[in-house]
């Protein structure tokens, strides 16, 4: 049975007991390069990785008010707090990935007339620093976890050109505390996305990798990378594209990587 049909069946079962939360919401994501689709099997440049956690989704109504979207929890890529969007398929240039593709965030909202979407790319603090060994899906993916102090990689993405490449892992850094008792992080590095033109049921959220790594040279034959370290100069440009001040880890600018299609 097609996965999308299973998603709709799960949404229907979710809504049988959801009181007024009876509006199915399905938000599709797609990877692009300068606006055109890109995948693991693309001719260079090709995608080598694109996975990220989404939390706190909300829809904007016609009166300018934001309304929560509740995650559907029947899917392996979501729990009640986060969804894992996975746009790589383990093929081609994504040899270090997985065959599973999770391209849609699925949930329900209260009935309404909506145009506008916002969400956070990141894991909420309490979950980010919980024990990953006892976490259930989608927080049990070891590829998405650093270590107990920093927690999860909120975003991991990579591109390969004909003879070069670049990858980036975004997550909290400068975290302090002990195992199970992290008290805070100097650079939270969570990414706030607001898309006022998003129309539920019609729009797709595009993540443009060319915009993300625009400050990196893909022709110098020297692969680059960024692991969110405060001393990594290679992080300054992609963090800026995400609207994050690399020095503080705070959202201080307007992101340009995520857009509406």
Regions of interest found by a model, annotated:
Residues 7-8, 157:
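General helical structural elements
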């Amino acid at each position: 049975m097609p996965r999308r049909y299973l998603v709709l069946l799960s949404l229907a079962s979710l809504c049988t007991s959801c009181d007024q939360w009876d509006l199915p919401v399905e938000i599709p994501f797609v990877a692009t390069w300068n606006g055109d689709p890109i995948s693991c099997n693309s001719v260079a440049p090709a995608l080598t990785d694109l996975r990220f956690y989404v939390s706190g989704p909300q829809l904007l109504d016609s009166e300018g008010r934001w309304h929560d979207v509740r995650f559907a929890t029947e899917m392996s890529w979501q729990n009640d707090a986060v969804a894992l969007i996975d746009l790589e398929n383990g093929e081609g240039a994504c040899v270090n990935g997985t065959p599973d593709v999770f391209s849609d965030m699925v949930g329900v909202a209260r009935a309404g007339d909506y145009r506008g979407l916002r969400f956070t790319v990141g894991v909420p603090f309490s979950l980010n620093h919980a024990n990953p060994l006892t976490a259930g899906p989608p927080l049990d993916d070891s590829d998405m976890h650093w270590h107990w102090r920093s927690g999860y990689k909120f975003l991991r993405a990579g591109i390969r050109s004909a003879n070069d490449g670049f990858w980036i892992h975004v997550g909290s850094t400068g975290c302090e505390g002990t195992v199970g008792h992290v008290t805070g992080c100097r650079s939270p590095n969570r990414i706030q996305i607001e898309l006022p033109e998003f129309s539920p049921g019609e729009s797709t959220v595009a993540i443009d990798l060319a915009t993300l790594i625009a400050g990196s040279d893909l022709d110098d034959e020297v692969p680059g990378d960024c692991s969110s370290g405060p001393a990594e100069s290679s992080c300054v440009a992609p963090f800026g594209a995400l609207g994050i001040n690399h020095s503080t880890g705070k959202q201080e600018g307007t992101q340009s990587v995520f857009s509406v299609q």
